[in-house]
């Protein structure tokens, strides 16, 4: 789930807002959410906003250890095991889902591929014919929480031995571009998003 979370010690919104630290995670949608939050807080509440470049794991670690930053503008809560304990301990409060449906992280194939090859909707089907998905798993960039999770799951499932290469993208943008290019060409694609 993509959520906006407020740390326990965060300054409340008021006419005398003061200093507030907010994250800008290292993916495109977070940059938009951060820009909107920054604008509203500075223009609407007179806050002195400090934007902190980060990503999920470092931001949550900092929050757990220091109570900062005050606002995590976009967190994919299902990709990090520390989110729920921090929420349960009262160290963060979830304000809202940033994306209308909350966001879904998963392993995907394009609908056109599933329709023409329904067997590819299962792991066993993919491993029976990895070339049908292009012979590779498009993975998230290093530093994202999904990097470790996906790598461990692929190793445990024997992906490489079964003929499926893990291709780790250098950024969220190149991962998105690979999806868009596959759709434009109706080409095989399998990976995380």
Task: List the predicted regions and their residue ranges.
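Short, well-ordered beta-strand elements
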Residues: 16-29, 47-52, 134-138
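Pocket-flanking alpha-helical
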Residues: 34, 52-91, 174, 178-182
């Amino acid at each position: 789930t993509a959520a906006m979370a407020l740390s326990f010690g965060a300054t409340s919104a008021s006419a005398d807002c003061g200093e507030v630290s907010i994250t800008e995670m290292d993916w495109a949608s977070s940059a938009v959410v951060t820009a909107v939050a920054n604008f509203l807080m500075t223009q609407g509440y007179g806050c002195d906003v400090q934007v902190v470049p980060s990503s999920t794991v470092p931001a949550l670690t900092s929050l757990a250890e220091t109570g900062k930053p005050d606002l995590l503008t976009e967190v994919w809560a299902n990709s990090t095991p520390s989110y729920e304990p921090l929420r349960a301990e009262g160290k963060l409060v979830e304000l809202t889902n940033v994306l209308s449906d909350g966001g879904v992280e998963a392993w995907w194939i394009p609908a056109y591929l599933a329709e023409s090859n329904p067997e590819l909707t299962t792991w066993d089907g993919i491993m029976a014919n990895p070339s049908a998905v292009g012979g590779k798993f498009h993975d998230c960039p290093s530093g994202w929480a999904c990097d470790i999770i996906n790598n461990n799951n692929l190793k445990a499932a024997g992906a490489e031995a079964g003929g499926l290469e893990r291709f780790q993208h250098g950024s969220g943008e190149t991962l998105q571009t690979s999806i868009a290019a596959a759709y434009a060409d109706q080409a095989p694609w399998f990976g995380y998003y």
